[in-house]
């Protein structure tokens, strides 16, 4: 089980990312627009770095298990770590997943 503070920090980052998504996309489109002058593009880049919170970046979000908060071995399709997924599948609580045999 992960520390509750780490789970809360990740949830706060997800919320910040959603809150600043449009603003960040606007600034990135200005930065990548080759038709604009270098000064405007540089100004957009400095606003992106200085004005927006660091945790509002999507890259800082960590995929965590929905039940335990474990940061490693998380299957994106299920949102669960490998250990919890194995337990739930063995009890038949994940629909459509069966134990393989050949």
Swiss-Prot record:
Gene3D superfamilies registered for this protein in UniProt: 1.10.287.1480
Origin: domain of life: Bacteria
Keyword terms of this UniProt record: Ribonucleoprotein, Ribosomal protein, RNA-binding, rRNA-binding
Signal peptide stretch: none
Transferase as UniProt keyword: no
GO cellular component entries: cytoplasm; small ribosomal subunit
Gene Ontology terms, MF aspect: rRNA binding; structural constituent of ribosome
Single Gene Ontology BP annotation: translation
Task of the protein: Binds 16S rRNA, required for the assembly of 30S particles and may also be responsible for determining the conformation of the 16S rRNA at the A site.
PANTHER family the record matches: 30S RIBOSOMAL PROTEIN S14, SMALL RIBOSOMAL SUBUNIT PROTEIN US14M
NCBIfam families, sorted: PRK08881.1 (NF006477)
Description of how the protein assembles with itself and partners: Part of the 30S ribosomal subunit. Contacts proteins S3 and S10.
Similarity section: Belongs to the universal ribosomal protein uS14 family.
Protein name in the entry: Small ribosomal subunit protein uS14
Organism: Wolbachia pipientis subsp. Culex pipiens (strain wPip)
């Amino acid at each position: 089980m992960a520390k509750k503070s780490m789970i809360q920090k990740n949830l706060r980052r997800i919320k910040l990312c959603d809150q600043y998504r449009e603003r960040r996309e606007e600034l990135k489109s200005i930065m990548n627009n080759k038709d604009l002058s270098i000064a405007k593009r540089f100004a957009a880049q400095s606003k992106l770095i200085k004005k927006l919170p660091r945790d509002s970046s999507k890259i800082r979000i960590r995929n965590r298990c929905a039940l335990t908060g474990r940061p490693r071995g998380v299957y994106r399709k299920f949102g669960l770590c490998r250990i919890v997924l194995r337990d739930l599948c063995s009890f038949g609580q994940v629909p459509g997943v069966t134990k393989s045999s050949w």
